[in-house]
Design a protein with these regions (language model features):
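Bacterial N-terminal signal peptides that target proteins for export
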Residues: 2-13
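PEST-like low-complexity, intrinsically disordered acidic/proline/serine-rich tracts
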Residues: 2-3, 18-298
Length: 298
């Protein structure tokens, strides 16, 4: 086994350890997330997506004082797809998962030819930025398997994540995006309500995060449109349309269920990433570099 292969195994093992430390709900956790039924809808994204959208049509959600759907509370972290957004078998202790991609139908990211080769290069040469404690970015932060809390005020929705102390402050008051020359790890989010659906327009990426630990990537031209719709009091249907004409051949979509954390004594833990961290030094010493982002061919 060469050093490069060993380094990748070390990286995977480190992430397995992090996942093992994640606080999990007491009931039903041995059941894979995609086999849990939500409002009589299968949890697997390809089946949950159309079923949940249909269920949401007849659900009247609880309301905030300003009559918006009340999504506040603690929610269980997204599906365990931060390792690989596409379908994959169990490997190095990482559980098997179905693809999060519901469009196109084959569940694959529709890369341009040069970008498909670039993805392979990323996996072979660079450390996962999230593994180096950089922000996960959008949409990855939504399917990292750590919990988060949603808070709402008139004109804002706030998502406070347990993972890496990240937070998203989403104005819903109609203000424009920040200037196009401002480039951010977590991008710039602007929300609006379309009926009972929170629609979030996300722009201004710096092109540095990955979609998962496999090197799946985007450029600074990334544009994401997220839609969050309550299916019942304890389930949110999440979908995101992902567009980057410099990297992909077409827009594509992911979808999955978000479940409420119903533990009455739940608290989000203080997340430590850099403190006492040594794996980054070990992996870096084996030749894996910090990902610089990509400059698409002209």
């Amino acid at each position: 086994m060469n050093d490069r292969c060993f380094g990748r195994m070390m990286a995977m093992a480190a992430i397995v350890a992090l996942v093992a430390l994640t606080p999990l709900p007491a009931a039903g956790q041995e059941v894979p997330w995609y086999k849990i039924v939500h409002s009589r809808c299968p949890g697997e994204p390809g089946k949950f997506h159309p079923c949940a959208l249909e269920k949401a049509k007849t659900f009247n959600p609880p309301r905030t004082p300003d009559r918006k759907p009340d999504m506040q509370g603690h929610w269980i972290g997204g599906p365990e797809s931060s390792q690989d957004i596409e379908e994959h078998p169990e490997s190095f202790g990482i559980p098997a998962n179905p693809t999060l991609i519901v469009d196109p139908a084959d569940g694959k990211i529709p890369y341009q030819p040069w970008a498909a080769a670039e993805k392979q290069k990323n996996f072979k040469e660079y450390q996962d930025p999230q593994g180096q404690c950089f922000p996960s970015g959008v949409p990855r932060q939504m399917y990292v398997p750590f919990g988060f809390q949603i808070l709402q005020t008139p004109g804002h929705v706030v998502i406070a994540f347990e993972h890496n102390h990240a937070s998203r402050i989403i104005p819903t008051d109609g203000r424009p995006h920040v200037g196009k020359n401002i480039r951010l790890w977590e991008m710039d989010s602007r929300g609006r309500w379309e009926g009972d659906t929170l629609v979030v327009d996300v722009t201004n990426s710096n092109g540095r995060p990955w979609l998962d630990a496999q090197g799946n990537f985007f450029s600074a031209a990334l544009h994401v449109v997220e839609r969050l719709t309550m299916v019942d009091t304890d389930t949110i249907h999440y979908d995101a349309t992902i567009e980057d004409p410099q990297v992909y051949t077409r827009p594509w979509k992911i979808a999955f269920p978000i479940r409420r954390n119903k533990q009455p004594d739940h608290e989000q833990i203080e997340y430590a990433c850099h403190e006492g961290e040594r794996d980054e030094q070990h992996i870096g010493s084996l030749g894996y570099k910090t990902y610089p982002g990509v400059v698409p061919p002209q």
